Design a protein with these regions (language model features):
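Conserved acidic
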Residues: 1-193
Length: 193
């Protein structure tokens, strides 16, 4: 063992991993959340340019809307100031959606090369979008702060745990979850093929 699994000083808490229920589970549905971290960054306007520094003279007033993460870090809403990174991510998400639409059209038209091209492009955009979280969670990047990465993962943990709780409250058994995916027993009648 290298000790890499041990918590390092200053390291942020990652995504939520639900304990695995060992065994063979028939009829499992996988709920995977589209671009969870980028969506959180867009929806909560998470950016170095929107983080509200408690020591800074510009503080939100009573009537100012802010996004407050589960870690209690605060970010200006887009009404006050739209973040640079959320703006870039919105554009990238739109590009990825367009490539995915082109994949469907290429399949329909039986254009294999076009399908492969757009699949490669959407995958490259996906990696680029997810790299923004990696930058925010890194201590090496110049325009970051621990509040950024820790807020993103805290909102993700909160979201996934809330959804798991709602599923279980409705009688759907969750057998596993990891970061942005939930594996749940599908409500298929006993004895179904």
């Amino acid at each position: 063992l290298t000790g890499s699994a041990e918590a390092k000083e200053g390291q942020i808490t990652g995504g939520y991993v639900h304990d695995v229920e060992a065994g063979l589970h028939p009829w499992i549905a996988v709920l995977d959340f589209k671009s969870m971290y980028p969506s959180i960054m867009i929806g909560n306007n998470v950016c170095y340019t929107t983080r509200i520094d408690p020591s800074h003279p510009e503080q939100p007033g009573q009537d100012d809307a802010t996004h407050v993460s589960p870690t209690e870090a605060a970010f200006w809403t887009t009404e006050h100031r739209k973040g640079l990174v959320p703006s870039l991510l919105e554009d990238l998400m739109n590009q990825r959606d367009e490539h995915k639409a082109q994949i469907k059209q290429a399949r329909k038209d039986e254009q294999v090369e076009k399908e492969e091209f757009h699949d490669s492009m959407q995958y490259a955009v996906k990696i680029m979008m997810n790299s923004f979280y990696g930058v925010f969670a890194s201590g090496f990047y110049r325009f970051t702060h621990k509040d950024l990465g820790s807020s993103i993962t805290a909102w993700a943990r909160q979201n996934i745990k809330t959804i798991i709780q709602k599923l279980e409250d409705e009688g759907h058994h969750v057998v596993y979850s990891d970061t942005d995916s939930i594996f749940v027993c599908s409500p298929v009648p006993e004895g179904s093929p």
